[in-house]
Amino acid sequence: MNLIEFPLLDQTSSNSVISTTPNDLSNWSRLSSLWPLLYGTSCCFIEFASLIGSRFDFDRYGLVPRSSPRQADLILTAGTVTMKMAPSLVRLYEQMPEPKYVIAMGACTITGGMFSTDSYSTVRGVDKLIPVDVYLPGCPPKPEAVIDALTKLRKKISREIVEDRTRSQNKNRCFTTSHKLYVRRSTHTGTYEQELLYQSPSTLDISSETFFKSKSPVPSYKLVN
């Protein structure tokens, strides 16, 4: 029996009969056989690859990596996500069957990391594209931290009511019972916050009279506008 506690699995009789509910039985079977889709784009994924070895042995958690999103119920994003990759990531997530879960691994996936400071093509957080269940910070996180994130996800699944999760996601795709995200606009695919980015004006957009009028001070915003 799994070590994760269930509210109704500890009710046993003298005949060693376990009384439970279909929901708890479904949660127990799902948390013991997570099939992840590995979406690694950067160095954080190397730390997850070390779990495959005999030292950490992630097979004991029932993890079976899959190459198809239609056979996976967990997607693990590790590394930087760019705007050009955003449509592919959203499509992979939408092709996964319900119930499905997301683990964001590393600073670059959670906030954009160091590439988000001066990059125009980096998505500032994968949770702007798909709902995230477990955040795993670090640059990069250690394999022990990945195991801890998997344990937290398993505990979340054990206390989950499938009907509530399905009902909430049908109403709003980026809304879960764990973190209440309210979408203000549609999914960002390639044009994420383009209106907030500064683009230096070209000399062709500035008239010659304004450009060569150096004697009178002209504010920079007038040159742009």
UniProtKB/Swiss-Prot annotation:
EC number(s) stated in the UniProt entry for this protein: 7.1.1.-
Cofactor(s) the protein needs: [4Fe-4S] cluster
Q: Which Pfam families match?
A: Oxidored_q6
Q: Does the keyword Metal-binding apply?
A: yes
Which protein are we looking at?
NAD(P)H-quinone oxidoreductase subunit K, chloroplastic
- Please verify whether the record's keywords include Transport: yes
What's the stated role of this polypeptide? Answer: NDH shuttles electrons from NAD(P)H:plastoquinone, via FMN and iron-sulfur (Fe-S) centers, to quinones in the photosynthetic chain and possibly in a chloroplast respiratory chain. The immediate electron acceptor for the enzyme in this species is believed to be plastoquinone. Couples the redox reaction to proton translocation, and thus conserves the redox energy in a proton gradient.
- Top EC category: translocase
Co-factor binding comment: Binds 1 [4Fe-4S] cluster.
Give the record's keywords alphabetically: 4Fe-4S, Chloroplast, Iron, Iron-sulfur, Membrane, Metal-binding, NAD, NADP, Plastid, Plastoquinone, Quinone, Thylakoid, Translocase, Transport
Task: Tell me which family the UniProt entry assigns to this protein.
Answer: Belongs to the complex I 20 kDa subunit family.
- Single GO term (MF): NADH dehydrogenase (ubiquinone) activity
Location within or outside the cell? Plastid, Chloroplast thylakoid membrane
A single Gene Ontology CC term: respiratory chain complex I
Q: Which reaction does it catalyse?
A: a plastoquinone + NADH + (n+1) H(+)(in) = a plastoquinol + NAD(+) + n H(+)(out); a plastoquinone + NADPH + (n+1) H(+)(in) = a plastoquinol + NADP(+) + n H(+)(out)
Protein residues bound to [4Fe-4S] cluster: C43, C44, C108, C139
- What's a GO biological-process term for it? electron transport coupled proton transport
For this protein, the record's Gene3D superfamilies field holds: 3.40.50.12280
Q: How does it sit in the membrane?
A: Peripheral membrane protein
Quaternary structure per UniProt? NDH is composed of at least 16 different subunits, 5 of which are encoded in the nucleus.
